[in-house]
């Protein structure tokens, strides 16, 4: 369990926790949506923090709401090192209650990419990467690339 290994826990410092923090994000943040989730984000120089809103309208049973939050926390925990700084608040929609865990995680990743919070994945093309040549290393008769 997470309690036995504290390094695997989702740290409190990476959470949006107070009502005032949520209000700031909802009032000043940008928003993007997906059929399962809605993301409110506010970029900043602070480390990335996650907040979640999963109401009883999404799922009347606590076990269902907690499953959604657990999936989002786990995805965020793995993404923390590469995520851009700022506050991210996820609002679950009612369709999330019927979605599988991978569907929820994928929707979260799509929203983060759309918000520009994650670096774009490298294209899996067949072309080798372009060779970069500094202009000062070229001889006067050699054309630039």
Curated annotation (Swiss-Prot):
Q: Where is the composition biased (Polar residues)?
A: 134-145
| One Gene Ontology MF term | ribonuclease P activity
Q: Name one GO cellular component term.
A: ribonuclease P complex
Identify the SUPFAM superfamilies for this entry: Ribosomal protein S5 domain 2-like
Could you tell me the keywords of this UniProt record? Endonuclease, Hydrolase, Nuclease, RNA-binding, tRNA processing
Is Cytoplasm set as a keyword in this record?
A: no
**EC number(s) on file:** 3.1.26.5
Keyword tRNA processing belongs to the record: yes
What job does this protein perform?
RNaseP catalyzes the removal of the 5'-leader sequence from pre-tRNA to produce the mature 5'-terminus. It can also cleave other RNA substrates such as 4.5S RNA. The protein component plays an auxiliary but essential role in vivo by binding to the 5'-leader sequence and broadening the substrate specificity of the ribozyme.
Q: Which NCBIfam families match?
A: rnpA (TIGR00188)
Query: What family classification does the UniProt entry report for this protein?
Result: Belongs to the RnpA family.
Q: What is this protein called?
A: Ribonuclease P protein component
Annotated source species: Xanthomonas axonopodis pv. citri (strain 306)
Query: What does UniProt list as this organism's lineage?
Result: Bacteria, Pseudomonadati, Pseudomonadota, Gammaproteobacteria, Lysobacterales
Which gene does this sequence derive from?
A: rnpA
